[in-house]
């Protein structure tokens, strides 16, 4: 058995996507993101280079393993199978042809699940040293693993109304009734909150933009659900490492970027800008507010780390034209070009005003291990971001190494989670 250690620092990890350096800078300058501004001043911050293909599951599996997709095994948002073939493909080219093949049933897709990851994640390493972990909505965690602590998978909000399968999304299952009582269905999103995004008169008939699907069903309702569920579980278990993820900014970035930055598109009507122009800014402000609440709740010996796995940029004109010609999704924001993400850290031992050196998503796992006080695996690809800690922490906690965490016993997944007929999570656009 591995020795049990006390963590050097307790760590809270908040994951988002679609938040790049430019978005942070403009939001801070406009005064729209006061909590982010405070964290950047009191702590460390900087751009985070990302990976290709720039999709949530491979990028976030890299963030939490410190390994490249070719090593950890998660290479896309889904796996694909051609009709009549037993061969599973991990990557297919994105575009109209593949979309057509899916529509006519010649290609089937299967969501990425926890069985796809071939390398140990942070929670495996921490649990091996006796440190409990709390994991909420991280990509690729369905079915959940039998961790020391708890794990709530990103399928909870999809399966919550199924009395049998809802329980399969949480390990251990003890608090599933309480978690379900905290969930927020799309129809229950507060009207006062909605009015901050879209004017009330515009939410009636005649609005030809499917804003309810993108803003309410795919962004706000799930983010509110996991925020409330995460708060409940964290309070119940109080794990030294807690990780949660908010997907909503990525969703609204894909759908509403054109209205926030009409000058980058040229074909946005003034009426549309009035309707939807503040959705993206308001969503960033909401995330900043939530992160600010978590920062204010930090206790001595705790560090808050906010990570965006990639940014968001306008869909190029040629792709918008192709999309229109082939009946595509009409997205206006994309991260197919691997725009930088962002990292912020604040708390006990973080150096105020620190700026990241050349950093990437590969550096997050080694850095989190270091902050917690565990050795960094030499087979991890990234480096420890030592520039974010103050001199006192650095002197008290030199970086230590271990050859690998891959010799750890595999944490079994829960037996109840059925992988057959698993509904897809809302499709992420590249």
Regions found by a protein language model. Give the residues of each.
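Membrane-interface soluble catalytic domains
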Residues: 1-9, 78-114, 119-120, 124-129, ...
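Active-site neighborhood of phospho(di)ester-bond hydrolases with catalytic His/Asp-centered motifs
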Residues: 39, 305-308
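Short, solvent-exposed turn/loop segments enriched in Gly/Ser/Thr/Pro and often Arg
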Residues: 45-67, 136-146, 245-249, 310-314, ...
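A long, amphipathic alpha-helix that forms part
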Residues: 4-7, 22-24, 216-242, 258-306
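His/Asp/Glu-rich, glycine-adjacent segments
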Residues: 67-270
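Charged, often glycine-rich, active-site loop that binds/positions anionic groups
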Residues: 58-68, 147-156, 319-323, 392-396
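Acidic/histidine-rich, surface-exposed loop or edge segments in extracytoplasmic proteins
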Residues: 15-19
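Short, structured active-site-proximal loop/turn typified by the sulfatase FGly-forming signature C/S-X-P-X-R
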Residues: 22-78, 132-136
């Amino acid at each position: 058995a591995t020795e049990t250690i006390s963590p050097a620092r307790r760590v809270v990890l908040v994951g988002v996507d679609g938040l790049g350096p430019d978005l942070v800078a403009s939001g801070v300058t406009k005064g729209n993101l006061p909590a982010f501004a405070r964290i950047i001043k009191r702590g460390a911050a900087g751009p985070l280079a990302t990976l290709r293909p720039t999709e949530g599951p491979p990028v976030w599996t890299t963030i939490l393993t410190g390994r490249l997709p070719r090593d950890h095994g998660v290479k896309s948002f889904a796996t694909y199978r051609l009709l009549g073939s037993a061969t599973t493909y991990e990557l297919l080219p994105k575009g109209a042809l593949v979309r057509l093949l899916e529509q006519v049933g010649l290609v089937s897709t299967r969501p990425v699940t926890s069985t796809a990851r071939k390398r140990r994640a942070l929670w495996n390493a921490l649990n091996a040293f006796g440190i409990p972990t709390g994991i909420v909505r991280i990509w690729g965690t369905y079915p959940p693993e039998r961790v020391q602590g708890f794990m709530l998978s990103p399928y909870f909000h999809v399966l919550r109304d199924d009395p049998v399968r809802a329980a399969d999304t949480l390990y251990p299952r003890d608090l599933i009734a309480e978690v379900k009582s905290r969930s927020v269905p799309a129809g229950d999103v507060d009207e006062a909150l909605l009015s901050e995004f879209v004017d009330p008169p515009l939410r009636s008939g005649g609005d030809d933009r499917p804003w309810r699907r993108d803003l309410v069903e795919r962004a706000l309702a799930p983010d509110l659900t996991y925020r409330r569920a995460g708060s409940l579980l964290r309070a119940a278990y109080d794990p030294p490492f807690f990780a949660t993820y908010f997907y909503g900014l990525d969703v609204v970035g894909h759908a509403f970027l054109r209205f926030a930055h009409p000058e980058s598109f040229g074909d946005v009507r003034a009426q549309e800008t009035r309707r939807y122009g503040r959705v993206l800014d308001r969503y960033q402000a909401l995330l900043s507010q939530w992160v600010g609440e978590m920062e204010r709740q930090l206790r001595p010996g705790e560090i808050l780390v906010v990570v965006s796995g990639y940014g968001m940029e306008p869909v190029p004109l040629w792709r918008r034209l192709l999309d229109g010609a082939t009946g595509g999704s009409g997205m206006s924001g994309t991260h197919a070009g691997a725009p930088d993400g962002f990292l912020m850290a604040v708390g006990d031992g973080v150096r105020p005003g620190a700026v990241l050196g050349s950093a990437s998503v590969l550096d997050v796992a080694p850095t989190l291990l270091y902050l917690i006080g565990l050795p960094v695996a030499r087979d991890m690809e990234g480096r420890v971001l030592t520039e974010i800690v103050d001199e006192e922490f650095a002197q008290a906690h030199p970086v230590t190494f271990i050859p690998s965490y891959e010799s750890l016993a595999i944490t079994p997944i829960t037996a109840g989670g059925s992988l057959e007929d698993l509904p897809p999570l809302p499709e992420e656009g590249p």
